Amino acid sequence: MDILPTLDPNDLFSAKGLVVVITGGGSGIGLAITSCLSQAGAARVYILGRRLSTLQEAARSVGGAVVPVQCDITNCSSVSAAVAKIEDEIGYIDILINNAGVQGPDHKPARDAETIEDLQKILLIDPEGWQPTFAANSSAVVGISAAFLKLLDAGNRRRGWEGGKIPLGRPRQRDITGFTDDERSSQIITVGSISGLNRFITAGLAYGASKAAAIHLSKMLTYLLAPWGIRSNVINPGVYPSSMTAGTKDNYSYMEVPAGRKGGYRDICGVVLYLVGKAGAYVNGSMENTDGGRLSVMPATY
C-alpha cells in the first residue's frame, strides 16, 4: 500500500460537488443530514417530502443549494414526477438517501402489561396501521431506489465509470480524467434504526419489523446492484432528537445508553460524511450503527 505524502481530512470527508437526494430531508434526522451535506459542499441537495411548507422552511433555514421537491414516497406517480424534475434539472445524482419513515402503532405499553387480556389488547392496537408503516419504512426503500437507478447510473458515467451491467468476471472500466484522486461510485444510503436490530420494543412492533426489513433490503440491494456499480449502505440511528422521540429524556444511565445521552448533530453528520466522502469510497454493504452503545446493553441481533 502506497503511503500518501499528504492527506487532507477536509477533502477526505467532503461532500463537495455531490448531487444528493434525501427523502424526509425537511425535518428530524433528515434535516440534520441536509444541513451537514450543504455545509460540506454538496452541489445540490434535493429534499423530498409530502409537506411542501416544511421542505420550503428547511431550504430557507439551511440555505445553500437545497431544493424542495414535494413527493409522497409511497405513491408511484408522485415519485415518478420527482424523478422527472430532477432528471430535467441536472440529469444525474451521486447519492440517494432513503430517510423518510413513520412510527406506526405504538406497542410500548406491552412491556408493562400485567394480564394476558391487557397484552392482547395492546398488541392489537391499530391493526390497520401496519400496512402504511411498512409502505413508508420498507416498500419505499425498494420503490425509491428503483426509481432513481437511472440517475445513479448517470452519476457513475459522469465520474468516468463504465455504465450499465458488467459481465461476470470482468472489472468495470473507467476513464479517470478529472477524477484521479476520487474513486467513489454512486451510492444508496438507507436510514434504518437500531429498532430493527434489537428485541426490546422501543417504538412499536410494526416500526421495529419494518426497519428490520429496510435493513435487510439494503443488504440485498448491495448484492443485486454490484454488477451495476451502485453501492448500498445502512445507517442505524439510536435515540436522536425527532418527532418520534419527543418527550423522552436527554440523559441516560450506562445500562440504557453507555454514552449517557441522545445522539446529536455532529454524531449523525460524522457517519454521513464518512460514507459520502472519499473516506467511504471502499465501503459497500456496510451497516453503521450510531447509537451511543445502546445495542451493546440491549438484547439484539446484528
What function would you assign to each model-found segment?
Residues A226-R231, V283-G285:
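Short, small/polar-rich loop/turn modules that mediate ligand/substrate recognition or access, typified
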Residues V102-Q103, P109-Q131, L149-P227, V239:
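Catalytic loop of short-chain dehydrogenase/reductase
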Residues E256-I268:
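A conserved structural motif in NAD(P)-dependent oxidoreductases
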Residues S38-E57:
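Conserved glycine-rich Rossmann-like NAD(P)H-binding loop of the short-chain dehydrogenase/reductase
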Residues V62-S77:
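Rossmann-fold cofactor-recognition segment
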Residues I3-N10, L273, N284-Y302:
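Short C-terminal tail/terminal secondary-structure segment
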Residues V19, G26-G28:
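Conserved glycine-rich cofactor-binding loop
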